């Protein structure tokens, strides 16, 4: 249930002054029922010519869960907007807001001796379970004040200052409130007479320079850590024949924990030429976050006997740029537009709470402060072993004198030249997928649209780059966990009938235990995950109104569209938009096709 009540008042005694009141209440109730039946699978034994049965999901069971959540929000604001002397435009906002959110849940589970009735009352009382998900039981309240003043002079000089003063119930008294100011300025240089009245520059329709700086607070990473508490159940203990569940100590409270601050600086420009025939937007940005939560490492001995609390210790920095280029034109009845975008973002750990380095090598190898978060460590690659002789004359890399190595195995680089392949030969030579915000380092795309005499077409391309994917488990080696092998492992090192090794793309097949020599992350098994995808295409035709109005239809458009039509990528088994699928268990991306019409009377 979602409800919203809004009331607006315009003051008759002062031009431009208005007040607005808003109250919203949302309530959700979620009921879940899972009935899991016991089933039997049969596996054929070729040698004995029999089918062996195995029972799964035994015994049958039923799970019921009830969840409810409520959220309310109140806003009250004063707005003042006025144009003075046809030149000075002033807008002022002052707003008060508060919100509260709470959730609760309960679940139960029973096993069945007979599963004819799929209701929880029909289950067995023996070994029944009832509980609640602790992460879905909470109550949070926020309050805040917002102020904003916006001024522009003839749409040429623009300025805005604002602030937020926010409070959160998640923090202790004295640390609940945070003040977060921001400001921005803009200068439409195209409105200056030396451009508007200078004929050689008449092609400049709009040129705006802008800069902004703002601070924001975030309380989402902490919940009531200033309170002492317990986790239940903790460890269990046996006294006599009875098992008693215990309480687990949550750790030391921290009454000083508070908002972490995010400070963002943005500098950019907007440019339109020839009435929008060409356009460009360029932005450079820096976002510095201070007070990220972390636990002290190495400063407090483990003999303290308690888990340390989180504190506002860590810092990071996002920086990058974004470029958007556009072109639109009309040639007789043909209209078209093209938009291209490219962005590069990297995240750097400015300070990461970690123990002191033992030496300079330990600092280089194991510490992450002042380093980019997308930096990945791996062995360098010298290809594959081509023969047993090649293995014997190369540094040992399995720790067993080469006893588990075979031709076709990955040949790791002896990076430090000590004749031994170990962890000391790992170095930063790959890029992880993400900047910790779910996006690759580079993103790019294109939007193309065209229209001609009622026909229209729209295309959306999307891509990413600057990151790698490494295959694991069933994509990395055959017979994983005693299962089968995927078809791409046919292209592997193998022996012919005379015992000669035939080269292949993958190492030779053997049992998983002796395959572990090929598990290590190395450049050879690290794939460039850059991609370009045709995300969507839509083609439509709008029937002329002089035809549709005969049938009392104002507008009729017929269309067909498709999504995820093709992808250009070096990855064969993983969707580059979801590189977390590098274990091979995610459902492949689907192509979707739709046909329909838009009708209005």
Regions found by a protein language model. Give the residues of each.
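Extracellular/periplasmic, surface-exposed regions of secreted and cell-surface proteins
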Residues: 1-36, 50-378, 517, 521, ...
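Glycine-rich, aromatic-lined ligand/substrate-binding cores of catalytic
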Residues: 437-471
């Amino acid at each position: 249930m979602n409800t919203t009540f809004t009331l607006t008042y315009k003051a008759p005694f002062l031009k431009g002054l208005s007040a607005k009141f808003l109250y919203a209440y949302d309530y959700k109730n979620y009921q879940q029922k899972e009935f899991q039946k016991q089933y039997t699978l049969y596996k054929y034994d070729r040698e004995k010519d029999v089918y062996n049965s195995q029972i799964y999901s035994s015994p049958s069971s039923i799970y019921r869960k009830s969840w409810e959540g409520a959220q309310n929000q109140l806003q009250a604001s004063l707005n003042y907007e006025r144009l003075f002397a046809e030149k000075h435009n002033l807008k002022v906002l002052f707003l008060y807001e508060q919100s509260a959110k709470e959730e609760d849940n309960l679940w139960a589970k029973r096993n069945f001796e007979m599963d004819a009735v799929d209701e929880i009352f029909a289950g067995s009382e023996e070994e029944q379970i009832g509980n609640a998900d602790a992460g879905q039981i909470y109550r949070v309240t926020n309050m805040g004040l917002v102020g904003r003043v916006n001024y522009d002079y003839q749409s040429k000089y623009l300025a805005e200052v604002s602030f937020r003063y926010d409070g959160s119930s998640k923090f202790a008294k004295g640390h609940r409130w945070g003040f977060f100011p921001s400001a921005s300025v803009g200068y439409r240089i195209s409105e200056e007479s030396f451009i508007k009245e200078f004929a050689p520059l008449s092609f400049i329709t709009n040129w705006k320079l802008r800069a902004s700086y703002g601070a924001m607070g975030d309380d989402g990473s902490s919940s009531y850590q200033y309170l002492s508490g317990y986790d239940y159940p903790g460890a269990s203990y046996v006294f006599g024949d009875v098992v008693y569940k215990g309480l687990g100590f949550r750790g030391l409270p921290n009454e000083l924990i508070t908002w972490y601050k995010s400070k963002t600086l943005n500098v950019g420009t907007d440019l339109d030429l020839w009435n929008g025939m060409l356009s460009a937007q360029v932005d450079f940005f820096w976002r510095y976050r201070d007070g990220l939560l972390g636990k002290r490492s190495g400063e407090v001995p483990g003999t303290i006997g308690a888990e340390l609390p989180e504190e506002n210790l860590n810092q990071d920095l996002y920086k990058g740029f974004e470029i958007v280029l556009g072109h639109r034109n009309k040639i007789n009845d043909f209209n078209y537009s093209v938009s291209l975008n490219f962005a590069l973002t990297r995240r750097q750990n400015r300070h990461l709470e970690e123990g002191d380095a033992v030496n300079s090598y330990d600092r280089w190898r194991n510490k992450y402060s002042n380093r980019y978060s997308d930096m990945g460590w791996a062995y360098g690659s010298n290809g594959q072993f081509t023969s047993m002789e090649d293995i014997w004359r190369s540094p040992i890399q399995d720790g067993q004198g080469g006893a588990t190595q075979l031709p076709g195995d990955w040949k790791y680089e002896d990076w430090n030249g000590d004749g031994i392949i170990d962890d000391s030969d790992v170095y930063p030579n790959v890029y992880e997928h993400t900047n910790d915000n779910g996006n690759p380092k580079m993103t790019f795309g294109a939007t193309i649209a065209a229209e001609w005499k009622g026909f229209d077409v729209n295309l959306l391309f999307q891509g990413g780059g600057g990151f790698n994917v490494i295959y694991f488990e069933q994509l990395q080696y055959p017979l994983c966990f005693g299962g089968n092998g995927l078809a791409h492992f046919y292209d592997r090192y193998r022996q012919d009938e005379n015992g000669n090794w035939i080269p292949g793309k993958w190492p030779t097949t053997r049992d998983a235990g002796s395959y572990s020599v090929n598990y290590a992350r190395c450049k050879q098994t690290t794939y460039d995950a850059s991609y370009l995808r045709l995300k969507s295409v839509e083609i439509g035709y709008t029937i002329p109104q002089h035809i549709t109005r005969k049938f009392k239809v104002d507008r009729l458009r017929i269309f067909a569209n498709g999504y995820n039509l093709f992808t250009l990528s070096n990855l064969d088994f993983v969707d580059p938009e979801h590189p977390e699928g590098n274990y091979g268990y995610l459902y492949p991306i689907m192509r979707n096709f739709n046909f329909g019409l838009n009708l209005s009377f």
